[in-house]
């Protein structure tokens, strides 16, 4: 997130208390927490049907009503086409269109997730050897 002008805000006691707890839990500055919340709120208003999930350091856009993140629907669409995605996965045409519209607006975010998921098994094992088993040796 880019630097912006200082902004003063008065918060309700409830919101202030919540920010204090989240600040202690996440160790993120309250201003960063508010910026994250504002960004997600703006995106959910621009794209009704999109929500966010995951830990603070790796929040992901997902399509509400499906089990799929936006990047997963985009990956399925690019690999199978709309007709197969709609017939083989729990997503409506509206939900697929929503994911594609979100991708069109935030391509960098989704492309990064697609790239991350495209890693080879050997690379995943190198990153997390205790979680990802060694790929079988050929030959």
Predicted regions and their residues:
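Short amphipathic alpha-helical segments
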Residues: 9-11, 19, 26-39
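Intrinsically disordered, low-complexity basic tails/linkers immediately adjacent to helix-turn-helix/homeobox/MYB/SANT
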Residues: 56-64, 114-139
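Helix-turn-helix DNA-binding helix
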Residues: 33, 96-97, 110
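Short alpha-helical "recognition helix" segments of helix-turn-helix
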Residues: 22, 84-87
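Short Lys/Arg-enriched helix C-cap and helix-to-coil transition segments
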Residues: 48-52, 108-118
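Short, amphipathic alpha-helical "recognition" segments used to contact nucleic acids or chromatin
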Residues: 66-80
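Short, Lys/Arg-enriched anionic-surface-contact patches
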Residues: 1-2, 42-68
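Short, basic interhelical loop/turn and adjoining N-cap
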Residues: 28-29, 87-98
């Amino acid at each position: 997130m880019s630097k912006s002008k200082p902004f003063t805000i008065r918060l309700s006691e409830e919101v202030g208390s919540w920010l204090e707890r989240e600040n202690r839990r996440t160790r993120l500055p309250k201003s960063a927490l508010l910026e994250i919340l504002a960004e997600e709120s703006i995106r959910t208003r621009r794209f009704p049907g999109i929500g966010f999930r995951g830990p603070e350091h790796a929040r992901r856009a997902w399509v509400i009503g499906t089990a799929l993140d936006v990047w997963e629907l985009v990956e399925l669409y690019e690999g199978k086409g709309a007709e197969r995605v709609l017939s083989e996965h729990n997503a409506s045409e509206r939900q697929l269109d929503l994911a594609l519209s979100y991708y069109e607006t935030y391509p960098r975010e989704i492309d990064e997730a697609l790239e991350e998921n495209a890693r080879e098994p050997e690379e995943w094992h190198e990153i997390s050897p205790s979680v990802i088993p060694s790929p079988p040796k050929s030959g």
